[in-house]
């Protein structure tokens, strides 16, 4: 009689274990889907891609994607770039140049700033580090577009005099509500 009770108890435990495993799997799948959706909304993936394409840092990889990775005990967020046909997927920090990584970072930052309803002013320190001249021009055009079309104010600081001069040419104070300041000496500014 004890063997039968033990066998029944084991069978009942097996059934309960399968039910619990099924519930846990369903809850994990729901949590994963929820987190993936929250990540997509938090990072404003569509806007990041729109901004990223405007600067155009890479000839093939035009799309950015964020993916939560739950495959290990320590979940993490992975960032990928994809080509137009979504055939090749890369982890940018392994294959991109410093300039391309900076452009990706700038796109992520600007998307977050543009989605802010509380702030109309964006502060950026030296946004063109390591960029070539084409990307610098595209970045200035993007800034100009943000100021004109999105109604945001952008305050830039840079040590690059060429970038400063290029900004003054592409966003002159007489056509835009722009102002350019230079640090003349310690604590002393000069307006252009």
Where do the language-model regions lie?
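Short pre-catalytic strand/loop immediately N-terminal to key active-site residues, enriched for Gly-Thr
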Residues: 89-94
């Amino acid at each position: 009689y004890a063997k039968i009770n033990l066998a029944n108890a084991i069978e009942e435990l097996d059934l309960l274990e399968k039910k619990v495993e099924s519930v846990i799997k369903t809850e994990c799948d729901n949590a994963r889907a929820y987190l993936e959706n929250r990540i997509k909304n938090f990072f404003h993936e569509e806007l990041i891609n729109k901004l990223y394409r405007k600067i155009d840092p890479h000839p093939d990889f035009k799309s950015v994607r964020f993916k939560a990775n739950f495959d290990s005990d320590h979940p993490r967020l992975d960032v990928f770039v994809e080509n137009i046909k979504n055939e090749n997927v890369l982890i940018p920090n392994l294959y991109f140049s410093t300039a391309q990584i900076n452009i990706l970072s700038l796109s992520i930052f600007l998307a977050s700033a543009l989605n802010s309803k509380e702030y109309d002013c964006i502060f950026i320190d030296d946004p063109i580090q390591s960029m070539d001249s084409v990307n610098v021009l595209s970045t200035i055009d993007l800034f100009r577009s943000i100021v004109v079309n999105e109604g945001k104010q952008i305050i830039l600081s840079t040590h690059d005099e060429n970038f400063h001069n290029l900004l003054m040419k592409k966003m002159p104070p007489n056509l835009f509500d722009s102002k350019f300041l230079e640090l003349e000496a310690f604590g002393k500014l000069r307006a252009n």
